[in-house]
Regions:
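Predominantly the structural core of cysteine protease catalytic domains
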Residues: 16-17, 36-45, 65-185
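Alpha-helical support elements that line or immediately flank enzyme active sites
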Residues: 29-53
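Short, well-structured active-site flanking segments
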Residues: 48-64
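A short glycine/serine-rich beta->alpha loop
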Residues: 22-32, 89-93
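N-terminal zymogen propeptides
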Residues: 1-16
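A short, polar/charged loop/turn motif at coil->beta-strand junctions and beta-hairpin connectors
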Residues: 9-13, 60, 169
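Hydrophobic aliphatic residue packing
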Residues: 23-26, 49, 163, 173
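Short, conserved catalytic-motif segment at the N-terminal edge
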Residues: 13-25
């Protein structure tokens, strides 16, 4: 748990990551339910710029690659999981939604972090399935992930300060929430 007094004392009154040169270009997820993949790849891109000196204007990781392998297993060189399947078919992965847990688990297995040029995200039509061997074709690998669970009763100011502190400490956060369709319209 983050100490609120400490968090408030280390958070500047104003911060703009664009001025620091950390933010890559804004991307459009189109009509697909891949916001979770965009959030995670964006956080990876910011980390790459901030921590390993990547250039914000030139880094572009594939949201499609992460989303695809979030629902489809890649090739397992040890042959422990090559016959594993998900209940979601390959053509459902962009419409099914997801969350940070799904994405981080895939990234911990070195799936994702691939180059956008190799696996472009298409907003006009559902793209073809990827080869299983493409799962580990990564440009960047996840080293660490930090998770903070906010309970419903979490004080709003505390939650805001925790997120601000994490942005200052790690450069970016990826955020997931559940939106039930019955609350739309």
């Amino acid at each position: 748990l983050v100490n609120n007094r400490r968090a408030r004392s280390t958070i500047p009154t104003k911060y703009d990551a664009r001025q620091e040169g950390y933010l890559p270009a804004v991307r459009d997820q189109g009509r697909w339910g891949a916001c979770w993949s965009f959030s995670l790849t964006g956080a990876l891109e910011v980390s790459a710029v901030r921590d390993i000196g990547a250039v914000a204007d030139s880094i572009d990781l594939s949201e499609r690659h992460l989303a695809y392998f979030g629902y489809n297993t890649g090739y397992d060189a040890l042959d422990n999981a090559n016959k594993d399947t998900m209940t979601s078919p390959a053509d459902y992965y962009l419409t099914n939604g997801g969350n940070d847990i799904r994405g981080v688990v895939r990234l911990m297995n070195w799936n994702g972090g691939a180059d956008e040029d190799a696996y472009p995200y298409v907003t006009s039509s559902l793209p073809d399935a990827l080869e299983r061997t493409a799962a580990q074709n990564a440009k960047l690998y996840l080293e660490n992930a930090y998770r903070y669970n906010f309970a419903e009763e979490t004080d709003k100011d505390e939650a805001v300060n925790v997120v601000k502190k994490m942005i200052m400490d790690y450069g970016a956060v990826s955020w997931s929430y559940y939106n039930d369709a019955k609350y739309v319209n």
